[in-house]
Amino acid sequence: MTMSHLLTMSELSEVEISEILKDAEDFANGKESKTTEQTFVANLFFENSTRTRFSFEVAEKRLGLDVLNFSADASSVQKGETLYDTIRTLESIGTKAVVIRHEQDRYFDELKDQVNIPILNAGDGCGNHPTQCLLDLLTIKQEFGRFEGLQIAIVGDVRHSRVARSNAEALTKLGATIYFASPEEWKDEDNTFGTYKPLDELVPEVDVMMLLRVQHERHDHYETDIMKEYHEKHGLTVEREKRMKEGSIIMHPAPVNRDVEIASELVECERSRIFKQMENGVYVRMAVLKRALPNVLGGMKHELLV
């Protein structure tokens, strides 16, 4: 049986992306869908998360799913249990899908053909973040009604960003032109879906300014020299925002380091779609859960802790 995993954006065709975005738009416009029978899903987060974890949980509960919230610190993972055995255990007791965030790049490669329930990737190391990409696509589509011909700048810590990787690939597939702007030390030469240009050249040209969080936790050491000058050299300052072209928007996957990637007063400015992205995250995650569980139509309401 083919599993409806969601692991990377590269595995989704343009048609599949369009179908997910259409379902997400329907949910955004008030469509309701509930499971007809009790259906358990488990959220396995091995890295800290606020937006993605709670967004998935809200999406699950809106769909009437029973949510199993997994704590790695309080589980048999601490006793040496493998991720495969953890998923097989959840599968054996009746769980129908798992949402996983893990610090290991492509943790799912050794699992996807071995388990019998869908895996929804909520972020793998520096690798992929498909639901973040999909909510970004939804936000852009709501704004411009298209992807073809748009110019999009992805700015910041490109090397360590799974958001940059997923978005650059998907947006290129959909017809947008991608540019990167980054400190030299944080360029990702393996990401071939965009062209590097100086930030100040991109500011007046692009339709979307997509800022990336500086990922302190993924650096081998804290690049203090870069950080001292980051906002002035590589961040979206008030002065740069004034030079952005009419109708262009600001995006950021969050959490935001205010006055680092973006001036604090711009986080909720007229151009900003940062909190709109968060809102859209719920609708997109409802859509990918619907794809993973085609029988989603009604169900139970309470939460279980494991």
UniProtKB/Swiss-Prot annotation:
GO molecular function, one term: amino acid binding
Binding-site positions, carbamoyl phosphate: R51, T52, R101, H129, Q132, A254, P255
UniProt entry keywords in alphabetical sequence: Pyrimidine biosynthesis, Transferase
Pathway: Pyrimidine metabolism; UMP biosynthesis via de novo pathway; (S)-dihydroorotate from bicarbonate: step 2/3
Catalyzed reactions: carbamoyl phosphate + L-aspartate = N-carbamoyl-L-aspartate + phosphate + H(+)
Broadest EC class assigned to this enzyme: transferase
Any single Gene Ontology cellular-component annotation: cytosol
Coiled-coil intervals, chain numbering: none
EC id: 2.1.3.2
InterPro entries linked to this entry: Asp/Orn_carbamoyltranf_P-bd, Asp/Orn_carbamoylTrfase, Asp/Orn_carbamoylTrfase_sf, Asp_carbamoyltransf, Asp_carbamoyltransf_Asp/Orn-bd
Residues reported to bind L-aspartate: K79, R162, R213
GO biological process, alphabetically ordered: 'de novo' pyrimidine nucleobase biosynthetic process; 'de novo' UMP biosynthetic process; amino acid metabolic process
Record HAMAP family: Asp_carb_tr
Subunit: Heterododecamer (2C3:3R2) of six catalytic PyrB chains organized as two trimers (C3), and six regulatory PyrI chains organized as three dimers (R2).
Function text: Catalyzes the condensation of carbamoyl phosphate and aspartate to form carbamoyl aspartate and inorganic phosphate, the committed step in the de novo pyrimidine nucleotide biosynthesis pathway.
NCBIfam families: asp_carb_tr, PRK00856.1
Similarity annotation: Belongs to the aspartate/ornithine carbamoyltransferase superfamily. ATCase family.
Protein's UniProt name: Aspartate carbamoyltransferase catalytic subunit
Gene: pyrB
